[in-house]
Structures are given as structure tokens and as C-alpha cells.
A protein has these predicted regions:
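A Lys-centered signature of the CheY-like receiver
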Residues: 17, 114
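Two-component/phosphorelay signaling modules centered on CheY-like receiver
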Residues: 19-41
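Acidic catalytic/metal-coordinating carboxylates
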Residues: 45-48, 71-74
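Active-site beta3 strand of CheY-like receiver
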Residues: 56-62
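Active-site residues of response regulator receiver
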Residues: 64, 92
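Receiver (REC) domain active-site loop signature in two-component systems and cognate sites
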Residues: 67
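C-terminal output helix
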Residues: 116-125
């Protein structure tokens, strides 16, 4: 399958309470061969993510689970109600199997445990983007 070079870039929202993690994910997206991705927002918590998602209609979201105001679990539910076709990749330090399974049952399409390598994140993002 040849991607259409004129196709609209896939909109990505990065959600994490750590500025360092938001910056790292952004860097991987911008420098890691994910050419057809447009970063539409950076959110520090779930409540901010919902506000940004309403305005930007992202197709893919990277989501931390442990955040202030609204955690990732609540945010996944809100985003799926708002945008039922959204694809969510959980990126979390809560790396036990039960956490990953719970996130997937909520509707996330993938899970990457922190700390992660750039390659692991890139591959997980590609998998989630292909699922759309």
C-alpha cells in the first residue's frame, strides 16, 4: 500500500504530567521517521487533554495514567465518548500486566512502559496509527 503523499497528517495529542516525557515523545515523533504526523497539543493532565481534544480532534493520543486533576483512566473514557474512533497509546510507569490489561479494556490500542526506548515508542505509535 502506497501512502498518499498529499494525505492530511494524522493529528497527535501528547498527555503526560511530566514536561520531560512530553518533550521526549514530541522529539521522537518529530525526529523519528513519523513524517505524516502533526502534533496538535501537549496536555499536563486529563482535564486539559479533553479541552484540547475538543478543539483539535486528534486521531492519536499518547496517555499517561497517573496525573493530577483527571487521571489517564478517566481521560480515556472521556476521550472515547468525545471521539469514539480515537486511538490511544498508554505510556505509563505503571507497567504491571494488570494495568496494561485494564488500559486496553478501557479502549486503549497499545501500552508502552516507562522508561521506554525511542524505538519502542516509535514502534508502538506506528502500530496504533495503523489501527486507525
Amino acid at each position: 500500500m502506497n501512502p498518499n503523499p498529499k494525505a492530511r497528517p494524522m493529528r497527535l495529542l501528547i498527555v503526560d504530567d511530566s514536561n520531560m516525557i512530553r518533550s521526549r515523545i514530541s522529539r521522537v515523533v518529530q525526529n523519528g521517521g513519523l513524517a505524516n504526523v502533526s502534533l496538535v497539543g501537549l496536555a499536563r493532565n486529563g482535564a486539559e487533554a479533553v479541552r484540547i481534544a475538543r478543539a483539535t480532534q486528534p486521531e492519536v493520543v499518547t496517555m499517561d495514567l497517573t496525573m493530577p486533576e483527571m487521571d489517564g483512566v478517566q481521560c480515556i473514557g472521556e476521550l472515547l465518548r468525545l471521539l469514539p474512533k480515537i486511538n490511544i497509546l498508554v505510556v505509563s510507569a505503571l507497567s504491571d500486566k494488570s494495568t496494561a490489561i485494564a488500559a486496553l479494556k478501557l479502549g486503549a490500542r497499545g501500552f508502552v512502559a516507562k522508561p521506554f526506548s525511542d524505538d519502542d515508542l516509535r514502534m508502538a505509535l506506528l502500530d496504533v496509527m495503523e489501527a486507525r
